[in-house]
């Protein structure tokens, strides 16, 4: 399935702005959420083709949200790429075990992220 609409979940407005600009320039439609509650509202409202998920957020962390999304049949087929400052291998492995399709560490390399998105779609 081609990817055209991407949900970015990150509590940092700076990261949201960076990713939104990058993806819009790449031709993607973008919606954003700053926490888990907003993410689930956006999922229900907009049904994105891909989710970029931060890990360190208030309330539910990105690992928990990723697990909820990837285990829920109504969101089947929506891939999640974790985008986080957590660089430990144990975090990367845990993220993949929660159902993430890929794991990108911050600071994000724009061309690498775009290549990963294209590879999924």
Briefly describe each language-model feature range:
Residues 27-34, 42:
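Short hydrophobic/Thr-rich beta-strand motif most characteristic of the beta2 strand and flanking loop
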Residues 46-52:
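Active-site beta3 strand of CheY-like receiver
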């Amino acid at each position: 399935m081609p990817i055209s609409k991407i949900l970015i979940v990150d509590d940092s407005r700076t990261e949201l702005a960076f990713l939104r600009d990058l993806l819009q320039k790449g031709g993607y439609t973008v919606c954003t959420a700053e926490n888990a509650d907003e993410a689930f509202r956006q999922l229900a409202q907009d049904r994105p083709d891909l989710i970029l998920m931060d890990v360190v957020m208030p309330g539910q962390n990105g690992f928990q949200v990723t697990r909820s999304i990837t285990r829920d049949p109504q969101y089947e087929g929506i891939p999640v790429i974790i985008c986080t400052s957590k660089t430990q291998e144990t975090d990367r492995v845990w993220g993949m075990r929660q159902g993430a399709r890929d794991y990108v560490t911050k600071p994000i390399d724009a061309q690498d992220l775009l290549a990963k998105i294209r590879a999924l779609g």
